[in-house]
Amino acid sequence: MDIEKINKFSTKISETYSSELSRAKSSICIFLLGCYCKVHKPVLMRLRKQVVDKKVACLIAGDLNVKEIDDTELPDYSKKFELICNLILNSYRRPVPFIYIPITKAECGDGAKIELVTLCENPKYEKLKENIILFTEDIDTVPHQHKHLKNPHIGAKDEDDFLAKALGRVKTEINIMSDILTRDEENNHEQNRKAFKPENPEGW
């Protein structure tokens, strides 16, 4: 993904939407974090494709191409991670970071754990930290920083289970945003208390 495509996430949303569901989808951005080894990066990319197919903005940290960083002998990926976090924070969309921490395998690093620690320990990322959804295959392997998160972790048995549960959580986030948008615009409090019902539950 090039920088022009990424920049659209920071563009003010001014379109007219056909339904509250469409508007809700356009008001959030899923930010996928995790291990980027040869085993797990394809898992994140599969999830991103499925999320984008649902008309929801979705990024992985590797989307940002920065020549000054990528072309060096030892790329500073922590700097790239900071840049994309800042991009998300400056977006008009509500950021929803998903972190997938799989059981570490021989060929894997601890990228997802490092990202979690970075987000939790940097005060600048308080807004992101509040919205993090943590998916873990083994909670005992997660650094203690996860205790600072407001959301409980979601157990994932393996990659396929993570994909299924992450997509389910995307649906939940769409419902939450739709409810927020409805409350903002409706004066009838009784109407606001009604649960959001997607007009097309099968297709959401």
Question: What is each model feature region?
Answer:
Residues 1-204:
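Conserved catalytic or regulatory cores that recognize and/or transform ribose-phosphate-containing ligands
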